[in-house]
């Protein structure tokens, strides 16, 4: 490749060797190369941040600009052949300093890092002729991007206007003022470094400096200045340095030595406040001062340069602050996207897992979430700050706030999901733990303190929730305050504790109600069984006074009240361990009294069913009819007053029917004070407390029943029907008694004994006269009596039956043996067997003495 013009297509590969001669930034057709960022990346300039420097070179065409850059920076820009005079550099080219890191005699004097050199197309070339548009645009581009502008000028051109590129420098001054007008808050300062070529030393360098500075002052005075800048000086915007180089062809060794010496000037330096360019004092130190840098990060330079050139080539007013903001906007967006990709890799798995748990309705506390949230947020902010803080501060701060907002929005959602999961799982675990502890206490039978269990589990639940919250929050963020969530959690724990307490009290009430039901079932049942005991019948108590039948309901009511009072004491004592409020205890006792009345009424209705009541009435009647006042059973005789006893017993029993038909106390002849005993509905009772309670007449006004109606046990129709049925049953008992009395009159007639004596007189005398008969009769009588007293008649009879059976079997066996031993018998057996084979065969079962098939048990009995 001989000339730079051939390099316009370079930069499409990722091979670093493709950029050996640099990269064409802008071609001769004013097109910007989009591969600048790729070149900077291959040269490892992109991550440098602000640690890079940009130099541009100006000068007339064919004055050795590319040659100068190649010697200064080791670049490989193509140079003009000595045998012809034509344009070599087309457009603007850029290359990185190749001498970076070279050893020097003085280690402190080394070239700056990441120096980028732009070789600008020469001016006053015949190829463009009168077209100076590109010259102006390239000058504006170089001034907007470069820190140092090298003006390549020959010694003999100093003092000339065209030859010394005074027109180009005038353009540079005008462009600089244009940039200043767009950004009055910042003075865009640059260094104009005049490299005087073919310097022979006849004219001292200071004189050349003076001439050039006079020309610069004249040029500055000649340009039109905006209002307020009329008195400004060129030194307000530019610094100047000068250097003379020997002739390359005539003094090649000196030229190489001086260019090497000059290259060491391209290092970072500091302004010397003691020097004043107006007095002709110019620094010979490092050329890269901090104020020259355009403060465009290396990773955004390509985008920034493209935006600058786009405005220049479209003849728009160049607005560097706007371009910097646009660049900052673009780069911050890119950095934000890159940062969010890394953030997503860390956070998305947790978001997906949390979302899946929410869909399944199975809240799960995610382990490691807090550490991942803190780490990913810190990395995202730090990485963004590292890459984006070099750009426009306003844009950076705005985009950082946007990044933090995006990150915090998602992290806040994760935190809320984590706290919700901890909330729900904590509530479930709390309920299960309380229930498990209660069941364990019930199984052990040692008792348990429900309030203590709840308090302990509440402390554990809150501690666990706070552990999850503290391990998940991100310190330093406003959304990491979980006090509200903790308050809601504590409130629901209190609600659940109250619900569990109410459920436990409800279970306690159920246990007490079952105890009341059992006690009332026994006690009231005994009272009903004692009906009629006033006559000392079957239901009478063994000792003590006989209860009066008319006080039956008094006894039932007293038993009921005492039982319920005992149950209330049990309920109150147990409820105290639940930490229940007085209102809850009042509601529980009120429900207990209502439920207990329902139990009593159900027991009464059970005892007062038609069948049970009729049986009780009959027993009461029979106690009075069949037994006397001393409780001795009556043996009816024809002389007894059966009708009178029957009438008194029946009428006495009939008085029980109206007594039992209505629940009334004997003392007051009025229903018991059920309404006062139950009491009014507590103000703290909820509809749920009342929904399972049956209405009670005289207590619940909406029921529409009075207390008298509530105490009605038997209706009038039932009473009449019961009376009729009882009378029929009593009549049956009376008829039976009558028959018994009449049956007792039957006896053997007296003449029968006389007839027996007359007919059996001879036999009686024979027995009495014969001692043997008499003794035998006496022995048999004594033996029979002894056998009866010893209860041996059964075994004797069984032994007799067994002996007779055995004798029968033995007789059959002997008969068969006898028949088989004689000829006649054998013929008979043969005939019997033949007839049996020719006809049907039947199997005969061995029967017991009762005519049933004999079993193994019968055989065992036979063996006995």
UniProtKB/Swiss-Prot annotation:
Looking up CDD domains in the UniProt record yields:
GBP
Q: Where primarily located?
A: endoplasmic reticulum
Q: Which residue windows are coiled coil?
A: 480-506
Locate the region Disordered.
675-701, 830-864
What InterPro entries does this protein's entry cite? Answer: G_GB1_RHD3_dom, P-loop_NTPase, RHD3/Sey1, Sey1/RHD3-like_3HB
Q: Which GO terms describe its molecular function?
A: GTP binding; GTPase activity
Kindly report every residue range on the membrane side named Lumenal. Answer: 769-771
Q: Which UniProt keywords apply?
A: Coiled coil, Endoplasmic reticulum, GTP-binding, Hydrolase, Membrane, Nucleotide-binding, Transmembrane, Transmembrane helix
Q: What does this protein do?
A: Cooperates with the reticulon proteins and tubule-shaping DP1 family proteins to generate and maintain the structure of the tubular endoplasmic reticulum network. Has GTPase activity, which is required for its function in ER organization.
Q: What is this protein called?
A: Protein sey1
Organism of provenance? Neosartorya fischeri (strain ATCC 1020 / DSM 3700 / CBS 544.65 / FGSC A1164 / JCM 1740 / NRRL 181 / WB 181)
Q: Which gene encodes it?
A: sey1
């Amino acid at each position: 490749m001989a000339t730079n013009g051939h390099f316009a297509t370079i930069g499409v590969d990722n091979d670093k060797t493709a950029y050996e001669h640099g990269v064409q930034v802008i071609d001769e057709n004013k097109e910007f190369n989009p591969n600048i960022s790729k070149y900077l990346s291959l040269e490892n300039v992109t991550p440098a941040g602000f640690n890079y420097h940009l130099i541009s070179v100006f000068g007339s065409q064919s004055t050795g600009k590319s040659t100068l850059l190649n010697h200064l920076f080791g670049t490989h820009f193509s140079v003009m052949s000595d045998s012809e005079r034509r344009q070599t550099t087309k457009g603007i080219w850029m290359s990185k300093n190749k001498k970076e890191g070279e050893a020097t005699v003085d280690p402190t004097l080394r070239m700056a890092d990441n120096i980028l050199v732009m070789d600008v197309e020469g001016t006053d070339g015949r190829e463009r002729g009168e077209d100076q548009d590109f010259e102006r645009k390239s000058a504006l581009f170089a001034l907007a991007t470069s820190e140092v502008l090298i003006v390549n000028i020959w010694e003999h051109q100093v003092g000339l206007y065209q030859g010394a590129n005074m027109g180009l420098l005038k353009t540079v001054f005008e462009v600089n003022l244009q940039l200043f007008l767009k950004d009055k808050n910042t003075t865009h300062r640059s260094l104009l470094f005049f490299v005087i070529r073919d310097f022979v030393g006849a004219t001292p360098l200071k004189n050349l400096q003076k001439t050039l500075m006079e020309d610069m002052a004249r040029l500055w005075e000649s340009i039109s200045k905006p209002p307020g800048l009329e008195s400004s000086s060129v030194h307000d915007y530019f610094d100047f340095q000068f250097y003379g180089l020997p002739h390359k062809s005539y003094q090649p060794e000196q030229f190489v030595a001086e260019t090497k010496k000059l290259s060491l000037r391209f290092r970072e330096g500091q302004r010397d406040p003691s020097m004043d360019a107006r007095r002709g004092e110019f620094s010979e130190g490092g050329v890269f001062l901090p104020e020259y840098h355009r403060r465009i990060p290396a990773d955004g330079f390509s985008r920034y340069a493209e935006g600058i050139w786009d405005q220049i080539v479209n003849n728009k007013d160049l607005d560097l602050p706007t371009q910097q903001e646009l660049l900052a906007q673009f780069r911050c967006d890119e950095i934000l996207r890159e940062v969010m990709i890394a953030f997503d890799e860390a956070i998305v798995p947790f978001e997906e897992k949390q979302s899946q748990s929410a869909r399944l309705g199975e809240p799960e506390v995610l382990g490691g979430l807090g550490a991942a949230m803190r780490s990913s947020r810190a990395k995202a902010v730090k990485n963004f700050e590292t890459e984006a803080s070099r750009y426009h501060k306003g844009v950076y701060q705005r985009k950082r706030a946007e990044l933090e907002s995006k990150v915090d929005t998602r992290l806040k959602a994760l935190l809320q999901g984590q706290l919700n999961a901890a909330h729900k799982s904590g509530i479930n675990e709390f309920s299960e733990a309380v229930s498990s502890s209660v069941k364990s206490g019930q199984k052990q039978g040692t008792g348990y303190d429900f309030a203590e269990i709840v308090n302990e589990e509440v402390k554990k639940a809150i501690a666990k929730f706070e552990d999850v919250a503290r391990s998940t929050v991100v310190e330093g963020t406003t959304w990491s305050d979980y006090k509200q969530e903790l308050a809601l959690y504590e409130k629901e724990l209190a609600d659940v504790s109250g619900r569990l307490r109410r459920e436990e009290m409800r279970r306690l009430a159920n246990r007490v109600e079952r105890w009341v039901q059992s006690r009332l079932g026994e006690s009231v049942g005994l009272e009903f069984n004692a009906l009629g005991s006033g006559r000392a019948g079957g239901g009478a108590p063994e000792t003590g006074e006989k209860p009066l039948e008319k006080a039956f309901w008094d006894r039932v009511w007293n038993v009921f009240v005492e039982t319920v009072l005992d149950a209330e004491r049990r309920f109150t004592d147990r409820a105290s361990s639940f930490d229940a409020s007085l209102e809850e205890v009042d509601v529980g006792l009120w429900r207990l009294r209502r439920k207990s009345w329902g139990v009593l009424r159900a027991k009464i209705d059970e005892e007062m069913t038609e069948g049970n009541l009729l049986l009780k009435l009959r027993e009461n009647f029979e106690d009075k009819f069949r037994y006397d006042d001393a409780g001795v059973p009556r043996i009816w005789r024809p002389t007894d007053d059966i009708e009178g006893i029957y009438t008194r017993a029946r009428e006495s029993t009939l008085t029980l029917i109206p007594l039992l038909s209505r629940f009334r106390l004997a003392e007051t002849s009025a229903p018991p004070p059920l309404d006062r005993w139950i009491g009014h509905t507590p103000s703290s009772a909820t509809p749920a407390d009342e929904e399972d309670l049956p209405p009670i007449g005289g207590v619940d006004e909406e029921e529409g029943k009075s207390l008298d109606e509530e105490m009605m046990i038997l209706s009038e129709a039932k009473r009449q029907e019961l009376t009729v049925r009882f009378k029929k049953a009593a009549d049956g008992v009376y008829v039976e008694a009558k028959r018994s009395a009449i049956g007792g009159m039957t006896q053997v007639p007296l003449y029968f004994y006389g007839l027996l004596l007359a007919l059996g007189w001879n036999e009686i005398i024979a027995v009495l006269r014969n001692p043997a008969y008499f003794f035998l009769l006496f022995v048999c009588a004594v033996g029979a009596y002894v056998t009866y007293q010893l209860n041996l008649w059964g075994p004797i009879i069984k032994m007799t039956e067994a002996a007779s059976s055995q004798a029968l079997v033995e007789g059959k066996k002997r008969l068969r043996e006898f028949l088989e031993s004689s000829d006649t018998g054998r013929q008979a057996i043969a005939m019997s067997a033949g007839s049996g084979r020719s006809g049907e065969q039947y199997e005969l079962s061995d029967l017991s003495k009762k005519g049933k098939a004999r079993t193994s048990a019968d055989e065992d009995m036979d063996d006995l």
